[in-house]
C-alpha cells in the first residue's frame, strides 16, 4: 500500500471510462482516501478490488483533481435514486455512487478538505438551498422557498467541513430558468375566430350517402337554413335547393305537402311556360311546406329500402326542366313535335279524389334516391301504373309531413340527341312509363327493372341547349338494348353504383381475384407462439447514454486558483499502478513521453514477438528498389535518370524522358533466360515440401 494517513474508506461503485458508460458495468470497489500532509506523501485516492486486496487497481492523484460535483443525476434505470458524485481530474472524470446521502457528503467533504476546494460561485445550475452555509445544528429555513424544500433537507443533513463562502441569493430564479418549459404560455397563443365548419359537415354527410346512389337528396329543412349551405354532393356545388319548373311555382299551394307533376313528357310535348323572376337567381324554387326533419327521417328509413337503385354509374334520374319560349324556339328538334302542350293540371285536391294516374306523389327522405318518382301518362291502365297507390300515399303522408322538392336535370349536348330521341320514341310506341320506384307490396305487379347499360331516364324529346352551369357534370350516354329492357334485375343498393361519368361500367371480377386473404394463425386466441428473438444491436457511441448530468441539487467544489496554484503533472503518474483485476485492464497504460529520443524508440521496438526487428519501427525508406536501363548502344551515353519509387513498385520518371534503342534479339534472349530461371526455381520449391512429407 501507499504511504499516507487513511482519512476515509468504504465501498463505492465506480464508473467505467466516459466512452463506455453504458456498455460496461459499474464495478463495486473498495476506495481508500489517503492524506500525505504528515508523511510527505502525495494525496491520493486508491481503489481496490476488495477490502483485503494488497495492490490497488488504480491510484488517483488528487493533485490533478480540478473539481468535485455532488448530487448528480444519471438517466439510467438503476441510478434513478442513487447518490452520485464525481471527481474531475485532468486525465478522466470518475463518477462514484454512494449507498446513502450521508456517505456521499462524507466523501465529498473529505476530498474537498484535502484538495482545499470551496463551492464555486459561478455555478449556473445551482439549486436554492444547496449552499451548505448553515452548520449541522442550524436547519435551513426552507419554508419561504417551496421548490427548495427537498434540497434544503439534504443540505442541512450534511455538516460542512469548513467555513464556506456565501452564495448568490437569487438562486431560485436561476434554477427555474434552466428548467425546460413544459407548459405553453398563454402569451404565445394567438386567438383566432374559427371558420364555419358547417360546410365540412355537409360534405361529410354527402359522402356517407354515396352507397345510396344519391346525388341530389332533398333537404328536409327550412329554406332559410338550407340556403346557407353549399351543396350535398360534388356535382351541384352552387345550389342547395332543388329545382322545379317555374311554371309550377305559382300554382302550388303553400301548406300542401303533395305536389302534382305535369303529365308525361314522353309524348313529345313541352309545356308552355314563361320565365319567372327566380330563374335569374340560380333557378332556386322554394316550397314552403311543413318540415319535420328530426321525426321524418327515422320513420321513413324503411321506405327507402323498397325503392329501386338506378344501376347506371354516376347518374341520377331527374324530371326534365321546362324552358322559356325563347329558348325552345332555338332548338331544331322541336319542329318534329306534332302535339299541342296539354293544359296545366289543376291544383291538388284531397288524396282520395285523385287517381294514381293523375298525380304522382312520393315522399322522400334524406336517404332516398332521386329515382324514386314516377311520371304519369295519359291512356295508361291504372293496373300498370308505376305509382304507389293513393291509399299507401295517404299512410305515408300521415306518418311524415316532410317537404318534397324535385330537381329538373340540365340539358344535354347535341351529340346525345340521337340516343335520347330513340329512347323517347320507344316509350312513345310502347306507351310505357319510366321505371319508377315502388313499394315492396306492389313489387310483383308494378316493378319494371332497369338494364345496367340503359341510358339515363329522360322523358323529353332531344333538344339541344348549351350547359349553363359550370359545376354540372352531364350523365354518361349509353346504348340502350330494347330487347332486354325489363328483363334484368338491377344490382342491390350495397353495390354502390356511383362513380365519375368517365368511369366505364364494372366488369365481372374473375374468381381468381376473389380469393380470401391468407389465414394468420397468430391471431388465434390463446395461441402459444414462440416469441421472436430479441434483437440486440450495439449502440454507436453517439447514441449511448451521456454522462451523469447536473441537477438542481448539484453542488460543485473547486480549488481557488489564487490561493492554491495547480501543481504541474508529474511524469510518472501511473508508475505506482499495478493490475490485479482483468476487468480494469484498459485503465493500466504506459504514457508516452514526447521527449523520447529516436534511439530509445528503436530500442523500445527492437524486441518483437518473433525475435526480429519490428517493421513498424524501422522506416520503409531504408530498402529501396533501383531500376537500371540497358544501354545497348555503347557509343551513345545516356544521362542518368532519377527514379521515384511508388507504392506499387513502378517508377515515376522526371519530366525529362530518354528513349533508347532496344535490340530485339537480346531482349528475347534475356526474357527466355528469366523465364527458365523462374520455372526452375518454382519447381525446386514445390519438390522440397513433397520430400518432407515422405
Swiss-Prot record:
Residues 204-230, 358-374, 594-611, 685-694 have a biased composition (Polar residues). Residues 194-231, 309-378, 492-532, 560-656, 668-694 are annotated as: Disordered. Residues 5-116 form the PH domain. InterPro entries: Gab1-4-like (IPR046355), PH-like_dom_sf (IPR011993), PH_domain (IPR001849). The modification Phosphotyrosine is found at residues 627, 659. Gene3D superfamilies: Pleckstrin-homology domain (PH domain)/Phosphotyrosine-binding domain (PTB) (2.30.29.30). GO terms for molecular function: signaling adaptor activity. One of its GO terms (biological process) is signal transduction. The modification Phosphoserine is found at residues 251, 253, 266, 304, 402, 454, 651, 683. Residues 194-203, 672-684 have a biased composition (Basic and acidic residues). Phosphorylated in response to FGFR1 activation. Phosphorylated on tyrosine residue(s) by the epidermal growth factor receptor (EGFR) and the insulin receptor (INSR). Tyrosine phosphorylation of GAB1 mediates interaction with several proteins that contain SH2 domains. Phosphorylated on tyrosine residues by HCK upon IL6 signaling. The modification Phosphothreonine is found at residues 387, 638. Keywords: Acetylation, Phosphoprotein. SUPFAM superfamilies: PH domain-like (SSF50729). SMART domains: PH. The modification N-acetylserine is found at residue 2. GO terms for cellular component: cytoplasm. Identified in a complex containing FRS2, GRB2, GAB1, PIK3R1 and SOS1. Forms a tripartite complex containing GAB1, METTL13 and SPRY2. Within the complex interacts with METTL13. Interacts with GRB2 and with other SH2-containing proteins. Interacts with phosphorylated LAT2. Interacts with PTPRJ. Interacts (phosphorylated) with PTPN11. Interacts with HCK. Belongs to the GAB family. Adapter protein that plays a role in intracellular signaling cascades triggered by activated receptor-type kinases. Plays a role in FGFR1 signaling. Probably involved in signaling by the epidermal growth factor receptor (EGFR) and the insulin receptor (INSR). Involved in the MET/HGF-signaling pathway. PANTHER family: GRB2-ASSOCIATED-BINDING PROTEIN (PTHR45960), GRB2-ASSOCIATED-BINDING PROTEIN 1 (PTHR45960:SF5). This is GRB2-associated-binding protein 1. It comes from Bos taurus. The lineage of its organism: Eukaryota, Metazoa, Chordata, Craniata, Vertebrata.
Amino acid at each position: 500500500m501507499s504511504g499516507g494517513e487513511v482519512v476515509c474508506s468504504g465501498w463505492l461503485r465506480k464508473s467505467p471510462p466516459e466512452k463506455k458508460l453504458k456498455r460496461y458495468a459499474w464495478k463495486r470497489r473498495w476506495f481508500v482516501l489517503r492524506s500525505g500532509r504528515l508523511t510527505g506523501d502525495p494525496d491520493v485516492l486508491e481503489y481496490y478490488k476488495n477490502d483485503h486486496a494488497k495492490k490497488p487497481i488504480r491510484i488517483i492523484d488528487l493533485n490533478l483533481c480540478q473539481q468535485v460535483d455532488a448530487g448528480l443525476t444519471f438517466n439510467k434505470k438503476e441510478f434513478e435514486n442513487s447518490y452520485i458524485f464525481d471527481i474531475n481530474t485532468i486525465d478522466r472524470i470518475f463518477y462514484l455512487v454512494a449507498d446513502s446521502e450521508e456517505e456521499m457528503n462524507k466523501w465529498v467533504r473529505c476530498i474537498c478538505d484535502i484538495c482545499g476546494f470551496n463551492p464555486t460561485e459561478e455555478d449556473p445550475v445551482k439549486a436554492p438551498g444547496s449552499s451548505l452555509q448553515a452548520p449541522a445544528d442550524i436547519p435551513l429555513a426552507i419554508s419561504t422557498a417551496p421548490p427548495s424544500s427537498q434540497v434544503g433537507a439534504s443540505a442541512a443533513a450534511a455538516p460542512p467541513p469548513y467555513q464556506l463562502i456565501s452564495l448568490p441569493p437569487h438562486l431560485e430564479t436561476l434554477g427555474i430558468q434552466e428548467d425546460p418549459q413544459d407548459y405553453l404560455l398563454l402569451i404565445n397563443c394567438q386567438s383566432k375566430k374559427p371558420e364555419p365548419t358547417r360546410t365540412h359537415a355537409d360534405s361529410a354527410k354527402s359522402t356517407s350517402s354515396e352507397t345510396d346512389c344519391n346525388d341530389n337528396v332533398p333537404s328536409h329543412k327550412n329554406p332559410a337554413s338550407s340556403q346557407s349551405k353549399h351543396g350535398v354532393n360534388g356535382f351541384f356545388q352552387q345550389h342547395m335547393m332543388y329545382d322545379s319548373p317555374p311554371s309550377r311555382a305559382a300554382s302550388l299551394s303553400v301548406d300542401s305537402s303533395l305536389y302534382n307533376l305535369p303529365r308525361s313528357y314522353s309524348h313529345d310535348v313541352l309545356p308552355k311556360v314563361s320565365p319567372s323572376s327566380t330563374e335569374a337567381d340560380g333557378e332556386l324554387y322554394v316550397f314552403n311546406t311543413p318540415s319535420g326533419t328530426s321525426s321524418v327521417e327515422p320513420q321513413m328509413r324503411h321506405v327507402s329500402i323498397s325503392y329501386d337503385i338506378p344501376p347506371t354509374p354516376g347518374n341520377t334520374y331527374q324530371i326534365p326542366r321546362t324552358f322559356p319560349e325563347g329558348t325552345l324556339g332555338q332548338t331544331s328538334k322541336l319542329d318534329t313535335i306534332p302535339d299541342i302542350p296539354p293544359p296545366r293540371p289543376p291544383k291538388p285536391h284531397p288524396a282520395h279524389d285523385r287517381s294514381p294516374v293523375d298525380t304522382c306523389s312520393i315522399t322522400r327522405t334524406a336517404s332516398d334516391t332521386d329515382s324514386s318518382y314516377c311520371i304519369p301518362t295519359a291512356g295508361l291502365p291504372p293496373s300498370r301504373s308505376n305509382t304507389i297507390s293513393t291509399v299507401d300515399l295517404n299512410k305515408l303522408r300521415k306518418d311524415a309531413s316532410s317537404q318534397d322538392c324535385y330537381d329538373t336535370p340540365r340539358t344535354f349536348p347535341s351529340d346525345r340527341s340521337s340516343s335520347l330521341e330513340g329512347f323517347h320514341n320507344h316509350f312513345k310506341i310502347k306507351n310505357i312509363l319510366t321505371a319508377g320506384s315502388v313499394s315492396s307490396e306492389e313489387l310483383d305487379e308494378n316493378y319494371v327493372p332497369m338494364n345496367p347499360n340503359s341510358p339515363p331516364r329522360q322523358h323529353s324529346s332531344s333538344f339541344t341547349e348549351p350547359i349553363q352551369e359550370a359545376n354540372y357534370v352531364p350523365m354518361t350516354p349509353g346504348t340502350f338494348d330494347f330487347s332486354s329492357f325489363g328483363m334484368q334485375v338491377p344490382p342491390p343498393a350495397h353495390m354502390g353504383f356511383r362513380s365519375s361519368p368517365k368511369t366505364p361500367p364494372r366488369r365481372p371480377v374473375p374468381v381468381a381475384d376473389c380469393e380470401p386473404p391468407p389465414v394468420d394463425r397468430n391471431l388465434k386466441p390463446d395461441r402459444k407462439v414462440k416469441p421472436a428473438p430479441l434483437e440486440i444491436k450495439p449502440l454507436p457511441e453517439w447514441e449511448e447514454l451521456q454522462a451523469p448530468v447536473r441537477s438542481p441539487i448539484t453542488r460543485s467544489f473547486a480549488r481557488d486558483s489564487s490561493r492554491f496554484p495547480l501543481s504541474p503533472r508529474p511524469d510518472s503518474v501511473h508508475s505506482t499502478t499495478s493490475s490485479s483485476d482483468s476487468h480494469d485492464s484498459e485503465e493500466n497504460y504506459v504514457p508516452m513521453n514526447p521527449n523520447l529520443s529516436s534511439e530509445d524508440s528503436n530500442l523500445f521496438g527492437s524486441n518483437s514477438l518473433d525475435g526480429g526487428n519490428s517493421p513498424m519501427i524501422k522506416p520503409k525508406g531504408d530498402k529501396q528498389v533501383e531500376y537500371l536501363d540497358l544501354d545497348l548502344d555503347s557509343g551513345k551515353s545516356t544521362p542518368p535518370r532519377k527514379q521515384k519509387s511508388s507504392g506499387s513498385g513502378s517508377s515515376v520518371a522526371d519530366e525529362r524522358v530518354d528513349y533508347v534503342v532496344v535490340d530485339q534479339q537480346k531482349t528475347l534472349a534475356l526474357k527466355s533466360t528469366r523465364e527458365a530461371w523462374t520455372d526452375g526455381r518454382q519447381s525446386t520449391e514445390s519438390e522440397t515440401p513433397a520430400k518432407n512429407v515422405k
